[in-house]
Amino acid sequence: MSGGLFIDGKWRAGQGAGLSSTDPATGEDVWSAATATPADVADAVAAARKAFPAWADRPREERIAILRRYKDILVERAAPYAEALSRETGKALWETRAELASMAGKVDLSIRAYDERTGVTENAMPFGRAVLRHRAHGVMAVLGPFNFPGHLPNGHIVPALLAGDTVVFKPSEETPLAGQLMVEALEAAGAPAGVVNLVQGGRETGQALIAQDIDGLLFTGSAAAGTYFRRYFADRPDVILALELGGNNPLVVWNADDAPEAVAALIVQSAFITTGQRCSCARRLIVPDDASGAAIIEATVALAERLVIGAWNAENEPFMGPLISGRAAKAAREVASATPGKTILALDGVAGLGDAFLKPGIVDVTGLETPDEELFAPLLQVRRVSSFDEALAAANATRYGLSAGLISNESELWDKFLSRIRAGVVNWNRPTTGAAGSMPFGGLGASGNHRPSAYYAADYCAYPVASFEASMVVDTLKDIKGLKA
């Protein structure tokens, strides 16, 4: 399958170098086309700028109608779209089907969030009324990730379009097909020319996009990239930044030793789902330094060894697929080999499968200092501590603050954990990856910039306008103090 750019309502070939994506399970080609040059990107932004006034002025009900048609198209095309996402990312079909369902569900959630958080409110005043309205920013640049190449950019694009913004979307260079399919669906839904534009490419294309006259950058990706964007836009305070970055997420288990298998299931789902390629995956497991902690580790190892690893279309449905590429797997193994500690499960390759496949890894780092970095791979560090206070301190010993979890049967410990932990998503007896479109999703510190996405995406897609209004000119001369006679 091949594709290109979508600019001002037309598909066209890029003028840059070639770009291709491959199935990480097999290495087979999935998509190929030419990338966007800076001139192509400038055309896309100009088209979005030209389309903005009419789109923002369009009645809200008409924008909603287009987005609901988009939702219907996603539902109609769910089966082939899910297969395409699986081919490009390597994720199991059960996971990409869930991703498509989340994309479709985002439309109605965004409408509800828009009304609740950025709608119109009115209060009577002695002179008339005070009205709070919200206005679209303008042209939003959306940079998408590879791990959820549909769901995560969709979570920016849908609320932006609903608010009246126009969009220039650059998918990850690893997953260009996913971005193309999303834009094809929006085109089929009737999005007017210039309202949604697609440019393909890598870092150079992204750099060309942020250098343009944009009004906002909506980004999901690494903390390093987020730091770069903060610095880049330091002299452009007019550009709104919504940054959803990574995490070095802790999962604490305390006083839950009566059900080690159930605990292990939560740990495995936290650490190894999506082959560890979720920003909310647990990277650090903190347990008591006693027999109960040992039992939890033993049960987790036993369950991890039972996980089915395979291609997305394997007859025996896998829990874990490959990483996004062989390069990513090689880099992860290098980091794992440099991590201090005692290896419990090695982050090894999988016999009979390609070089992008890895087994889940577990390493005991008790008493050791480890780099405070996010490793986007199925590697879990275990730390044993002697008290719950020490567990809390270890959990908070990170510059990140995306997700955290407590597994415990004691509500008193949960109350303490909830009040002390520093993260934007804090779960109790649920995986750290547990999230919902009806709730905000975002983090603190190196994990974001206090503009959570999901239900709160409405907040950064429109700005508030406070108006004090009288329907006719009223004599306020008497209100002026200190007038000369």
Swiss-Prot record:
Q: Does the keyword Glycosyltransferase apply?
A: no
For the ligand (NAD(+)), the binding residues are G221, S222, A223, A224, A225, G226
- The UniProt gene name for this protein comes to astD2
Q: Where is the active site?
A: E244, C279
Give the E.C. number(s). 1.2.1.71
Which transformation does this protein catalyse, written as a reaction?
Answer: N-succinyl-L-glutamate 5-semialdehyde + NAD(+) + H2O = N-succinyl-L-glutamate + NADH + 2 H(+)
Q: In which pathway does it act?
A: Amino-acid degradation; L-arginine degradation via AST pathway; L-glutamate and succinate from L-arginine: step 4/5
**BP-aspect Gene Ontology terms:** arginine catabolic process to glutamate; arginine catabolic process to succinate
What's this protein's family per the entry?
Belongs to the aldehyde dehydrogenase family. AstD subfamily.
Instruction: State the function annotated in the UniProt record.
Output: Catalyzes the NAD-dependent reduction of succinylglutamate semialdehyde into succinylglutamate.
Q: Which cysteines are joined by disulfide bonds?
A: none
The record's listing under Pfam families reads: Aldedh
Q: What is this protein called?
A: N-succinylglutamate 5-semialdehyde dehydrogenase 2
Cite the entry's keywords alphabetically: Arginine metabolism, NAD, Oxidoreductase
Single annotated GO MF: succinylglutamate-semialdehyde dehydrogenase activity
